[in-house]
Amino acid sequence: MIKAGSAIGGKGMQPKAVGSGLRALLVLTALAIGLLTAWGALVRTTGSGLGCPDWPLCHGRIFPPLSDLAAWLEWIHRLLAASVTPLLALSGLIAWRRERRPDLYRPLAWALGLLFGQALLGGVTVILELPPTIVAIHLAMAMIILALVLVAAVRAHAPWASRPPPTDLEAVRPAAAAVRGIGMVGLALFALALVGASVTGSGASWACSDWPLCTGGVLWPGDLLGRVHMFHRVLALGVGIALGGLALALSGRREMPRGVFYWILAAFALYIVQIGLGAINLRMGFPAALNALHLGLAAAIWAAVVVAWAWALGEAQWAEGVPAESLRLRNLWEPYVTLTKPGIVALLLVTTAGAMFIAQRGLPPILTFVYTLLGGLLVSGGANAMNNVWDAELDRRMHRTARRPIPAGRLGRWEAAVVAALFSVAGLLILWTFVNPTAAALALAGWVWYVGIYTMVLKRWTPQNIVIGGAAGGFAPVVGWAAVTGRVDPMAFFLFALIFLWTPPHTWAFAILTERDYREAGVPMLPVVTGPRAAAFQVLFYTVLLALWSLVPVAIRALGFLYLVGAGLLNAWLLILALRLWQDPSRAPARRLYHASNAYLFFFFVLMVADRLLAG
């Protein structure tokens, strides 16, 4: 047992405040970076980013022409960037050599490295004439640099050190929950800023001339630029609601310092002003001054949320007599990750990505590929999280699931439900906006099937729950297919049915392995109702059906010889394991079949992709 705390995931955080000189220097550095970010917004909105067409000089000179305003705006931006460098370097050097504080010099070192990277990226931006993607990355780096310096500044002040540290884990749980809540809002703000930069860079600012709806009172326009514009507004609305809800929740938390609440309240107040400014900006035709103010306010809101998050993190890690490992940042976030069942999500994304490659007969358009996987990750993660919320009482009665975040008390049920809903809605919006409505509708159907039909009804009702409910997993490859083609073809139905037939052998093998858990919890899984031997026969039966169905693409000449040979080997492997399980329906054969079925599905999709690519 040691005094807890760490740098952002590192070791050796000292919770006491540092000298006033370093504190003042860090505040000055943060203000300089904030000014740099705001000036960058002015440069971007006035179109002055190419005011100096070369780099690092300006028109081949150290000083730009006196009569060229755009050149001076860009030159001052570069000068501010150059002035931030020594401030950052000096702060890091003092934190390292004099204070010997890893929790301070590590984020400052990262910030300095990112600053050099941002300077190089700025040169690329000029040379490539401001491509929107590079501009968005440049903004993202600026926001991360500001956040790292603010985290160091808050740690240097250490407001939590004014009171004795708590001595048990329960006492820091409210602060840990605040870290997660503020962090989620911060990530949403980060995404909102990047989407806003994409709206400006892509020309989508003018796609909707009305407010709050799009042109002509349309809620969701059909064209891509209109959808991107409205996605930004919907995301802004969601972030505003989340920020307001967070302020309301923190206002009633007496165990949390009021300073954390006041920073979030300030962010929410600025956000209300920001929304009004956005509407005025649209009505006035996006004048440069208002645009710059809009982006400057965004930086101020981001800074306020980061300060609140860093303060809450310090509170969560200010403990004595608690294992330090349990208070590391990654462990404070762990409940959210575990809630989404990342192993299941990863396998679903393999089938989605595989279907996209098969449909495209090669690499899909890169942005479509990224947005489909991102949307799929959020929707499937949200569905799994909602499954955890609904099954929380059931999970408490099962040894295998009792350590999940909700039954173990690491996460409240309402907090988990909010996270599940946010992930799901965000994923569906991404698919609808950046991919196509068909993919979004199919993802929604899969979500409803898994949460509404399987989790809420079938799981507790019938031993055939997994046969019917297993169709939910079949939607993942169909979403991938529709993302590329915009429709559902016969091959997509084949992939759906493949997952449908694969699910019973996979799940019942696991149910045989964990039969005692299901029996004690009262879940009517097939091995509980019929016994392991009868369930093992059903595993063999569905494995035979799966093997036969896998040959359909060869029969219709959709896939070729490579697939035929590979499918034969994979099916023989799984059939042998299923036969052995039927002969000996015990834990060891069930475990082998369960793990093999995961590998089977992965290699099956790799095989189909390889066959399509070779066939051209």
What are these language model-derived features?
Residues 143-148, 351-353, 405, 468-484, ...:
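Small-residue-rich segments of transmembrane alpha-helices in multi-pass membrane proteins
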